[in-house]
Regions:
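Alpha/beta-hydrolase active-site loop
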Residues: 130-152
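Short beta-strand element of the alpha/beta-hydrolase
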Residues: 72-81
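C-terminal catalytic histidine-bearing segment of alpha/beta-hydrolase fold enzymes
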Residues: 246-304
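N-terminal cap/lid segment of alpha/beta-hydrolase-fold proteins
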Residues: 36-70
């Protein structure tokens, strides 16, 4: 994952050609060239899937997490967001918490990097201020990937759910207008596209939502929070009202405030308590697998997350107790890492951090206690200070 909220990460920043026909051919990428180690326990692999065009083609970097066995498995597609700046510097998206959720329920999880992002070839198609067109262009990449996946013996082409966060949520809603065979439902986590330089961007977003809803027949589930740094309550409620105005079936889960920025809910430890029960109920309504049948893919933390405290603001480096200059620099580096994450410290100045899929609270404490004489405690988890003086 990258380091901006458009792709479910840590620090909140504000983000300021013709139709292609989808054909697909998959080739394994040399895993040795990947900076991120593949998770063998989750059967993680990386493919390139060729999106054929009339003139040009693009090769789409796609991550697959697959249950052990031959299938066929229901399919969950998870669409990434967009960082500000050059999208080629955006790292491969690995929503491990969500991947584990679906693997436990027997799904194969498909995570495509769209055209121009990360190691995918081609150029990101911006479409200027036309937010509706932007979403559809992104959705063409999702179509190409699904055309490949549904041709594989391991995939159940009649049981598909498509999800996305931020720009990926917007891509998911746009993809819904294709009414792709076998897709049962859509899940939108804080979806949208914000173009502050395009005048009335909110009106553009609302009008595009209305257009998407008028063309979509499958149900959708929407998640938005009140303190979302991109799409506040007025905006997301207008979007939802417009989307459903023509009869589209979309249920809005407005979960209020969460942490420093509700835009990050999908990837946060606290957020899973919001979205996972709702998504399970949604899958049940769609007639899709929703109960845990493969618990070996779970990743329970052995260290519970303490409650948020009012000890200090998250980004107040000078308020972090005990640590010296090197420790403050380490805390600053921690703030630039992805969720889930944890930072621990001890009265003797020892400190450590950990981030990523495998129990960051325990790893941070274990590392800290190597020098902390067993006195280390958690200072921050995700975007919450949990230190009690």
């Amino acid at each position: 994952m990258g380091k901006f909220p458009g792709i479910s990460t840590t620090i909140a920043f504000r983000a300021a050609t013709g139709a292609l026909r989808a054909g697909a051919l998959a080739l394994l990428i040399n895993a040795g060239a990947e900076a991120q180690e593949l998770n063998q326990a989750l059967n993680e692999t990386i493919l390139t899937i060729t999106k054929e065009g009339i003139v040009f083609s693009a090769k789409l970097e796609t991550t697959i997490f697959k249950p052990t066995g031959s299938g066929p498995f229901p399919v969950a597609v998870i669409n990434h967001g967009k960082s500000p700046g050059d999208v080629r510097y955006q790292g491969r998206y690995r929503p491990l918490m969500a991947a584990r959720y679906f693997l436990q329920r027997g799904y194969v999880v498909v995570v495509p990097m769209r055209q121009g992002f990360s190691n995918s070839t081609g150029n990101y198609i911006d479409a200027g201020c036309n937010i509706e067109s932007n979403g559809r262009e992104q959705a063409e990449d999702v179509r190409a990937v699904l055309d490949y996946v549904t041709a594989q013996a391991y995939a159940d082409r009649n049981k598909i759910v498509v999800l996305g966060q931020s720009h990926g949520g917007w891509t998911t809603l746009a993809f819904g207008t294709f009414n792709y065979p076998g897709v049962r439902g859509l899940v939108n986590f804080a979806g949208g596209l914000r173009h502050d330089s395009c005048g009335p961007w909110t009106a553009n977003l609302v009008n595009a939502s209305r257009s998407y809803g008028a063309k979509t027949v499958v149900p959708s589930l929407w998640f938005y929070g009140d303190n979302d740094s991109y799409f506040g309550p007025t905006t997301f409620r207008l979007m939802h009202a417009a989307y459903t105005s023509g009869g589209a079936n979309a249920r809005l889960v407005a979960f209020g405030k969460l942490g420093r920025d509700a835009h990050l809910m999908f990837s946060s430890l606290a957020g899973r308590e919001i979205w996972q029960p709702e998504v399970s109920a949604f899958l049940r309504q769609l007639g899709l697998p929703h109960e845990v049948t493969q618990p070996q893919y779970a990743n329970p933390s052995s260290v519970p997350v303490p409650p948020r405290t009012d000890f200090a603001p998250l980004y107040a480096l000078d308020s972090v107790p005990y640590v010296r200059e090197k420790g403050r620099a380490g805390y600053a580096a921690f703030l630039a890492t992805d969720f889930p994450r944890a930072f621990a410290l001890a009265p003797n100045g020892a400190w450590a951090s950990a981030s990523g899929d495998t129990d960051p609270q325990k790893r941070a404490l274990d590392r800290c206690n190597k020098d902390g004489q067993g006195a280390c405690k958690l200072y921050a988890v995700d975007d919450a200070v949990v230190w009690a003086n």
